[in-house]
């Protein structure tokens, strides 16, 4: 375990340990790639073949994300955001994969900003990344350790790429991960569901209302 040890260590083979409920003061919410360059009216019109994805974002991911942000902020949960954004204006610092794929959001560009519906508050943390997994190209692990985080809740897009990569890496680094299933999305429901099955050994999987209920119990217990 990391130096911020979780109190009750698991017995060998006790898979129920990853189902532990996140705890106040040791939990963060991470939002992945909900950025203007990937979700905007121009792109929606230009890519009608991704109609399912646009609908999933508009009707499920964004409204559920708003509910979750409200609950987390009210409970004092640390909120972090990560989007694809270069450290340079010309993109020379991008990963090879992003160069080959043509993924390019320059430093300080509007396209690299979080969408307005879920935008960070002034004192919340935004970490630009240049890889699928935020843990590969940033100092997010260092930041989470400094914040005393042991439980990491994850939402965002796309489920079977950057979200999945973050879940796997966070688990391998010793965080207890909760994937917010109905605050994530990808190009098809089939791809989304297949990913949930593939990574169930790396995380708890919960819906937004379940997590909000858990957070509500924290506040109730704190008030008693």
Listing of model-derived features with the role each one plays in the protein:
Residues 1-28, 70-75, 97-224:
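Active-site-adjacent betaalpha module
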Residues 25-27, 41-72, 76-79:
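A short alpha/beta connector and helix-capping loop motif
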Residues 30-32:
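Asp-based phosphoryl-transfer active-site loop
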Residues 35, 85-86, 158, 184:
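Catalytic metal-binding/acid-base residues of hydrolase active sites
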Residues 35-41:
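Short acidic, Gly/Ser-rich segments with clustered Asp/Glu that frequently serve as metal-coordination loops
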Residues 42-44, 93-94, 165-168:
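Short amphipathic alpha-helical segments
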Residues 77-84, 180:
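Short beta-strand segments at enzyme active-site cores
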Residues 88-91:
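Short catalytic/ligand-binding loop motif for oxyanion handling, primarily in non-cytosolic enzymes
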């Amino acid at each position: 375990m990391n130096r911020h040890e979780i109190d009750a260590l698991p017995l060998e083979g006790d898979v129920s340990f990853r189902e532990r409920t996140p705890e106040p003061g040791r939990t963060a919410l991470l939002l992945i790639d909900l950025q203007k360059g990937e979700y905007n009216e121009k792109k929606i019109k230009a890519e009608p073949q991704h109609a399912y994805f646009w609908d999933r974002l508009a009707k499920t991911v964004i409204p559920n994300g708003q509910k979750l942000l409200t609950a987390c902020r009210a409970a004092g949960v640390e909120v972090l955001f990560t989007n694809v954004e270069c450290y340079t204006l010309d993109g020379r610092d991008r990963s090879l994969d992003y160069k080959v794929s043509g993924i390019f959001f320059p430093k300080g560009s509007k396209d690299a900003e979080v969408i307005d519906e879920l935008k960070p508050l002034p004192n919340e943390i935004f970490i630009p990344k240049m890889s699928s997994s935020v843990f590969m190209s940033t100092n997010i692990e260092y930041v989470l350790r400094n914040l005393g985080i042991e439980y990491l809740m994850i939402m965002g897009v796309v489920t079977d790429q950057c979200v999945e990569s973050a879940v796997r890496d966070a688990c391998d680094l010793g965080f207890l991960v909760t994937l917010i299933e109905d605050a994530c999305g990808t190009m098809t429901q089939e791809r989304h569901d297949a990913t949930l099955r593939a990574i169930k050994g790396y995380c708890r999987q919960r819906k937004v209302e379940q997590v909000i209920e858990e957070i509500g119990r924290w506040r109730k217990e704190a008030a008693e």
